């Protein structure tokens, strides 16, 4: 089953209604959300896009396109700023070019928004080389050749930098589904809300997902022709008319929300102005006498007198009711807000620059992203840019450094912060650190477990190989007792550990004995693994529980048992991270333009190395050793290049900024990543988010910005804690980031208003931002 709607707010409302009616745990697997987020999951889960890909928001798209245009203008853009609608136009053209090049049906082609040259934007467009003038200077129009050239550069740049905009989520999902017939028809039941707001491309994606070949398959669309508010995004009434021809129509006539006096007014407007057939207009269930003063059209002489009248009208409202002042534009919303402030009328304004687009919030969201995946360069670039008080480098320039120049030298963006550029005796990167460790003693290890929950699941197999200067000197394989059920399937394949575990049942050791043997085998050597954070943390977590249990049995008075209370896996190297540092070398050796993924099995396959990823720890360790040796051979010539490059003053400034502001918090929060927190406490993710934001005033010139949003920050914290994050099912920071980060990155201010955390009773909003909200 698949439940799709248009906005995060609508999806949350739909999920709440489902949870109220159904308590079955299988509902947790039901996808409820908007189509863009669904397509994002589809692309990442199926390795259609690189796991390091980053989704751009509107501001990022504007910055990228403006930066690309500036690079191609002799002498720069003369201090001009690219109009936002020009960036939108170029992005739309790039989507259209992608569709034309990839065989999309013409009816799904992306709609290019209307955009013309006028007196307000002429100078800016001219500065960016986007208009052409005839010989007499009288005929000025868009230079469509220049527009398309910019659109193509934008497409190429996104590919090179592993960037996606919101159009890409739909375009790449459609292209993959079209090229992969076996992936289509996954769902026997699909319901789509607000269908009038979906574009032909979105509807075609839904059709590809629906399995209409089985009995009782259902695809139901909910919508209203009169609510096509997002027509500027490509939604068309023609789409609804096409559905009328292929689907059975059910009209819902009973309106349970609006009182009859209000609905009658809307129906009159629909009939007389929109020329709707009265037969299809809804009937009100509520018969309510029109309150005094309701449904009035009031003429005022001046804009100022209108504002004063609004203030007077609000004095007579009921204090417990929510009141919305809906205006056409952000400018008018600002004027109303200023008038209310002058009259001490408490209110919440949804307009202008969304709070989640403010510098401080963008920095905080980038911090959460690098905390979850520290090998992705785009959030690091965002973090460096947002924290730099003097903005010496543009966001695009920083992104180019981290996504292009760093990989050429085997550097990770995280190296900027985790390693110092000032001490010649210390390593400057993860790769150099690994190279030094490789010359000594390393332990390559892997675990197999009963599941992925570090706090609850248990280790059932440990395999390890000890290397000295790259040569194998010792091996270890252990099978540990467990009372937990071993899963029968790993995703869509049978779990090989079921048979393996039974075959070695006679060799089982207790978890306590197994961990003692393994940790004594490791000693104080660094450990290596593919996605080693998971393996190291489940060992540390389970062993910590065993040590605590043993202490309670021994009694606090007993001294520490050296055999038990010895060590934990602290210093570790991750071949998953190293594979990102060496990706250019891997691609060159494999003759590929893009890796299928950074999974162990794919890396072994494309490089033709010995070993196989069978999901049995001993096999996986041997494969990791093969990979490790290949990495060592590739890394040696890169280390000197790294040192020269990292001495660049621009790179040093970026490193110093991160190490001064972020490093202490990052190390603290990373140590909390897998620690289970009490469900009654504020979500650990919210604590981390708050700590990061509260640390910023000491390091940024944007104190005015912080004051502007200070009122709304507590609402954001409360929203994340009470509405978004479920600490019962997500007890660790890692689980909370894994489950909620995508939604946090897509939050908008109106999302706060659709919950009960906003105590203000008066709201100011533009028409478009109020869609989906309800007021008394």
Could you say what each language-model-derived stretch is?
Residues 247-248, 255-345:
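Helicase P-loop NTPase motor core
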Residues 440-443, 450-556, 591-597, 601-606, ...:
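Conserved non-catalytic scaffold segment of RNase H-like nuclease domains
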Residues 1-51, 181, 325, 770:
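P-loop NTPase Walker
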Residues 317-428, 599-609, 618-619, 623-676:
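ATPase/helicase motor core of nucleic-acid motors
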Residues 33-39, 190-194, 222, 329, ...:
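Conserved helicase core region in the C-terminal RecA-like lobe
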